[in-house]
Design a protein with these regions (language model features):
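A short, highly charged nucleic-acid-interacting micro-segment common to nuclease
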Residues: 137-143
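Secondary-structure boundary elements
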Residues: 55-137, 191
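Secretory targeting signatures
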Residues: 1-27, 171, 228-230, 239-279
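Linear, non-domain "peripheral" regions
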Residues: 2, 18-80, 265, 269-276
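C-terminal membrane-proximal segments flanking the terminal transmembrane helix
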Residues: 130-131, 202, 276-277
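Hydrophobic/aromatic-rich core segments of domains that either
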Residues: 143-226
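Alpha-helical and coiled-coil interaction segments, frequently adjacent to or embedded
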Residues: 206-247, 251-252
Length: 279
């Protein structure tokens, strides 16, 4: 049964490429302004910080505005792909896992400097999904994985979010009754969020890096409109697995991004001490 579903999904994905081959081509609407690269939406792809940075990371928080290039009136190949998963996998847990495996197995971790010649360069969900559909696999780093996963999950009928941790980015999917996650995650008191870390080639959906324990993290739920930033908290669950079963890659976020991010976290901790003490 599983093989039949995978075969059916493969045929459906191939259909996306045949019916609309242009969808498989990454956007070429880029222009340079000084040393920085911008897209047609006015978002800087080679910088995560600032009001026009792809993560809109400032001292006040962050907002992954690049994800909205693939939502609402801008839906394209990534949204269609997510809906294909929804049709082929009606059971929510299996659907969430198959979306995760698709990104984990087909996006090959590659640093931005090696692939694009920039310390940072973000791809939107349509560009990365299109490249995967066209070539069978495509290069990307942690924020590329997170953006694609979050858009696919939302298109497939889930609530999803992008989370920033020190030196890293990942996706979250809301699966309240999923019992295979290593840790139970909560966003501002709402439980049921599952960590989706796709840069490790052996990771399972819900695997959580032990090195993140005790680290402050924040998330933004995906929406066509700006959503409030939420603090991510977590607890050990009875299904915690050995940490040797998975991994992740650092380097997807530039050293400068890391420094700014940590300054922002420290600033956030000073602004909201009561929330930091909650368990």
């Amino acid at each position: 049964m599983k093989k039949a579903l995978v075969a059916t999904l493969s045929i459906s994905i191939l259909g996306l490429m045949i019916v609309s081959p242009a969808l498989a081509a990454p956007s070429q609407n880029f222009f340079e302004r000084g040393d920085e690269v911008y897209d047609s939406f006015g978002i800087c792809r080679s910088r995560s910080i600032g009001e026009d940075g792809f993560m809109q990371l400032t001292e006040h928080g962050f907002d992954p505005i690049i994800a909205r290039e693939s939502l609402g009136e801008n839906i394209d190949v990534a949204w269609e792909l997510g809906q294909t998963f929804a049709k082929e996998y009606p059971e929510p847990h299996q659907r969430a896992q198959q979306i995760f495996y698709f990104v984990r197995d087909r996006v090959v971790y590659t640093s931005d400097i090696d692939e694009f010649g920039h310390e940072e360069f973000a791809q939107n969900a349509d560009e990365l999904a299109g490249a995967v559909l066209e070539n069978g696999a495509a290069p990307g780093d942690c924020e590329d994985d997170a953006i694609l996963l979050a858009v696919l999950y939302k298109a497939a009928g889930f609530r999803s979010a992008i989370v920033l941790a020190p030196d890293h980015a990942a996706a979250l999917v809301h699966l309240p009754d999923y019992n295979k996650a290593a840790r139970g995650l909560t966003l501002e008191g709402e439980a049921g969020w599952v960590w989706a870390e796709a840069t490790g080639r052996t990771n399972a959906l819900g695997w959580f890096a032990p090195s993140f324990v005790g680290k402050p993290m924040f998330a933004r739920e995906l929406s066509e409109e700006a959503m409030p930033e939420k603090e991510l908290t977590y607890r050990l669950t009875p299904v915690q697995r050995a940490s040797s079963g998975g991994g992740f890659s650092f380097g997807g976020i530039s050293p400068f991004f890391s420094v700014v991010f940590m300054l922002w976290l420290f600033s956030s901790m000073r602004r909201r001490p009561a929330k930091r003490r909650r368990k």
